[in-house]
From Swiss-Prot:
Protein name: Protein CbrA
Top-rank taxon, per record: Bacteria
Similarity comment text for this entry: Belongs to the CbrA family.
Alphabetical list of InterPro entries matching this protein: FAD-bd, FAD/NAD-bd_sf, Geranylgeranyl_reductase
SUPFAM superfamilies, sorted: FAD/NAD(P)-binding domain
Annotated GO MF terms: FAD binding
Gene3D superfamilies: FAD/NAD(P)-binding domain (3.50.50.60)
Organism classification: Bacteria, Pseudomonadati, Pseudomonadota, Gammaproteobacteria, Enterobacterales
A Pfam match: FAD_binding_3
Length: 366
């Protein structure tokens, strides 16, 4: 039975970043259910927008995005729609439009060979015994059993590690549903849609590489029905759909209180969405995945006497920031307050009636 310093479960942005940063400094094994290459197998349903905080993480690490990860087009504003109030506003945002699956595979490709990575693998069982973490997983057609001094759960919303550490912990969850359509809009756009009759979270749309992606986060019980109802409503706002090319869904966490952030115990640690580190106001998680991976790297390499306590303290600033997102979310999903903010016109950038489209040139009006 092989023994490692660190076993990482999940290689999304958080797990991949941590594995890369610990390579050569600790003996690391990492398990991931995605394939190493291609589009077969699991892929994360996600709008695929890289927020400024995530961009800062790459600047800090000296990384640049390869062209095959970047999607087309790059858009500089978000069309915000309040369905009940029939209001639409445009707000400037500096997101990078990416192909999420290609991004995840690229992040994995950066992990040095010194890390033992198992792609297309399934973690079956974890337990703690004799001051070691035991992990049984299936990869390459057979089951393997390893031990590790430290266990890291980077396994997302349905984290097996979080459920093992905190079996009674309850956090609000939604089903995220999105569909892909052939792009029909003359001008591509991003949008953020609020309709409290449909969900107390929000919905979105993104133009990406010739497709129009429409999705949202809905109550688990009847999410599909609510999604369909919202699509029908959006025709009043000139949204064009047609026949769906692809449909996706997954569970997404929605932290709503301070206790929803859990960092681990007994030499087991949680990073990224597994720890509840996801914005309640935007459901953006990549930046917090990268930040929590960096914080845990620093703690593990310093080896303080009480690692879990040190990690909890080190994430305090991050948790406070995310708690601020909970407060912001409550403001955005309060119909009267949202309507007042949007009607005020604060930060709204009006679009010219005759702005150029892909079918007209900027000089056609001269």
């Amino acid at each position: 039975m092989e023994h490692f310093d660190v076993a990482i479960i999940g290689l999304g942005p958080a797990g991949s970043a941590l594995a890369r940063k610990l390579a050569g400094k600790m003996q690391v094994i990492a398990l991931d259910k995605k394939h190493q290459h291609g589009t077969e197998g699991f892929s994360k349903p996600c709008g695929g927008l890289l927020a400024p905080d995530a961009q800062r993480s790459f600047i800090r690490d000296g990384l640049t995005l390869p062209v095959d990860v970047i999607a087309n087009p790059q858009i500089f504003s978000v069309k915000t729609v309040d369905v009940a109030a029939s209001l639409t506003r445009n707000y400037q945002r500096s997101y990078i439009n990416i192909n999420r699956h290609a991004f995840d595979l690229w992040m994995k490709s950066l992990i040095p060979a010194s890390v033992e990575v198992y792609h297309d693998s399934l973690c079956r069982k974890i337990w703690r015994e004799d001051d070691k973490w035991h992990v049984i997983f299936r990869a390459d057609g057979w089951e393997q059993h390893i031990t590790a001094r430290y266990l890291v759960g980077a396994d997302g919303a349905n984290s097996m590690v979080r459920r093992h550490l905190y079996p009674d912990h309850q956090i609000r969850k939604y089903v995220a549903i999105q569909q892909w359509f052939a792009e029909k809009h003359p001008v591509p756009f991003y949008s953020c849609i609020f309709d409290n009759a449909i969900t107390d979270c929000y919905s979105w749309s993104i133009s990406k590489d010739g497709y129009f992606i429409f999705g949202g986060a809905y109550p688990m019980k009847d999410g599909q029905t609510r999604f369909t109802t919202l699509k029908e409503k959006m025709s009043a706002f000139q949204f064009q759909f047609g026949k769906a090319v692809k449909s996706e869904k997954c569970t997404v966490l929605f932290p709503s209180r301070w206790q929803d952030f859990v960092c681990g115990k007994d030499n087991a640690f949680l990073i990224g969405e597994a720890a509840g580190f996801i914005s309640a106001s935007s459901l953006e998680g990549i930046s917090y995945a990268l930040d929590s991976a960096e914080i845990l790297r620093s703690v593990l390499l310093k080896l303080p006497e009480k690692l879990n306590t040190a990690y909890w303290r080190a994430t305090r600033k991050l948790r406070l920031k995310l708690f601020g997102k909970i407060v912001k979310s409550r403001c955005l999903t309060a119909p009267a307050l949202r309507k007042w903010i949007m009607r005020s016109g604060v930060a709204h950038i009006p679009q010219l009636k005759d702005y150029p489209t892909r079918f007209t040139s900027p000089t056609s009006r001269m």
